[in-house]
């Protein structure tokens, strides 16, 4: 078993997930990547491993919305790599959806992946992170990404807006449970579209914000860090519609 710390990333992908994995790997973390896209997972593993050939990087193909399959995958992560010090939930589906124009089945599938998956991940992580908090020199953290959708939704993204509000609520509940036990629960609030060419809202900046949150000492814990400006993003969206 490696002496390296471990981050588990649920919802890996070529953007934030892989960038976060690569940054943590460069800092000496072993990395577990979970996603249902097998081909993309292989590409993510290569990218993360290049960041540090001396750490272990493993892929776990799983549909995060399948709560039984996810529980089995997380158990395998523990068997392969040991207990996590950081868990990062990044699973999301960004697609148009409107009230009256979207199948309830689609909304249900979104809830399974973005909230039941988050619930399963938090339930699994809970004993591992609280145990880690008992050891000196650790920074056990449960991290997630959110956006202004949680309290300022967009009607064209009705399902995603619903899921983000529920995620925010669930993470506040987790925070209430574990904060006194030494586990940091925190999120990065993304204020717009993530694009490589954006000087602020890009995957590398978000990864850095996540890493910095994970390393905060308890007196300095933040619940939320904002990357970008949601108010400005909404103004831009309104301007585009008016045009």
Which role fits each region the language model picked out?
Residues 29-43:
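Conserved glycine-rich Rossmann-like NAD(P)H-binding loop of the short-chain dehydrogenase/reductase
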Residues 88-96:
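Conserved NAD(P)H cofactor-binding loop of Rossmann-fold oxidoreductase domains
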Residues 110, 130-166, 172, 179, ...:
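Catalytic loop of short-chain dehydrogenase/reductase
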């Amino acid at each position: 078993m490696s002496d390296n710390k471990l981050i588990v990333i649920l919802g890996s992908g070529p953007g934030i997930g892989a960038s976060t994995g690569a940054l943590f790997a460069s800092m000496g973390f072993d990395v577990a990547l979970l996603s249902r896209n097998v081909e993309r997972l292989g590409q993510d593993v290569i990218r993360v491993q290049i960041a540090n050939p001396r750490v272990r990087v493993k892929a776990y193909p799983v549909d995060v919305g399948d709560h039984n399959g996810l529980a089995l995958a997380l158990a395998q992560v523990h068997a392969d790599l040991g207990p996590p010090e950081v868990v990062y939930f990044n699973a999301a589906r960004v697609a148009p959806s409107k009230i009256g124009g979207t199948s309830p089945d689609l909304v249900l599938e979104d809830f399974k992946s973005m909230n039941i998956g988050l619930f399963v991940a938090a339930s699994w992580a809970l004993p591992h992170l609280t145990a880690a908090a008992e050891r000196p020199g650790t920074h056990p953290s449960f991290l997630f990404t959110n956006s202004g959708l949680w309290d300022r939704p967009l009607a064209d993204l009705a399902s995603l807006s619903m899921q983000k509000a529920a995620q925010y609520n669930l993470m506040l509940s987790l925070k209430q449970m574990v904060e006194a036990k030494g586990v940091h629960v925190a999120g990065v609030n993304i204020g717009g579209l993530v694009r490589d060419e954006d000087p602020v809202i890009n995957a590398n900046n978000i990864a850095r914000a996540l890493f910095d949150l994970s390393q905060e000492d308890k007196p300095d814990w933040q619940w939320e860090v904002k990357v970008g400006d949601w108010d400005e993003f909404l103004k831009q969206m309104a301007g585009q519609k008016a045009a």
